[in-house]
Each structure stands twice: as C-alpha cells, then as structure tokens.
Design a protein with these regions (language model features):
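Charged low-complexity interaction tracts in eukaryotic proteins
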Residues: 1-8, 37-43, 47-91
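Positively charged, polyanion-binding regions of nucleic-acid-associated proteins
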Residues: 1-28, 33-34
Length: 92
C-alpha cells in the first residue's frame, strides 16, 4: 500500500498551500499522479479514496500539516470529485 501513500501525498502536496482548509481533486488525478510517479495505476482507483476514508490514516506528511486540534479527511464532493477537508476534533 506504499504506492497509495505516494499517490495521495503527491495529489495533496501538488495542490496544498499553507493555511488551506480544503484541497480539491478529481479521481482522474489519481491515475495521472500514478503515471507521473511511474507507479502501476491501480485497477480500482476508488480503492485509494476508500482506503483513506475507512481503513487507514493519511500519510504522516499530510497529517503534520493540520493545526493542533484538527485533522484531514477526504470527502466526496461530486461524481468522481473529492476534497481533503480540515476538520476539528480527533480522527478516531
């Protein structure tokens, strides 16, 4: 699953600006980032999103950008459209 971390980190940091409270991306961006990183494109791109929503924490590099008392989560915002959203509270 390290490839998922590489892809999601790339997506986040390509778009993140210090102080941002949300970072939008589209599902097709996952495939583009995998190609750019020379990683085999996962057959089910949705599994990348699902993994970070329900199975595992986001990579530490992303977690560290959240201010104290906040965490990042991935939210669906449309058909094949997603957003990292800074949320107050605890991830678990």
């Amino acid at each position: 699953m390290a490839k998922y971390d590489d892809i999601i980190n790339g997506i986040f940091f390509d778009r993140y600006e210090a102080g941002a409270t949300s970072v939008r991306f589209e599902r097709k961006d996952l495939a583009a980032k995998a190609h750019q990183l020379k990683i085999a494109v996962p057959k089910n791109l949705g599994d990348i999103i699902y993994s970070y929503k329900y199975r595992k924490s986001l990579p530490q590099e992303i977690i560290k950008t959240a201010p104290e008392g906040f965490y990042w989560r991935i939210k669906n915002v449309g058909i094949a459209q997603h957003e990292f959203v800074l949320t107050q509270g605890s991830e678990f």
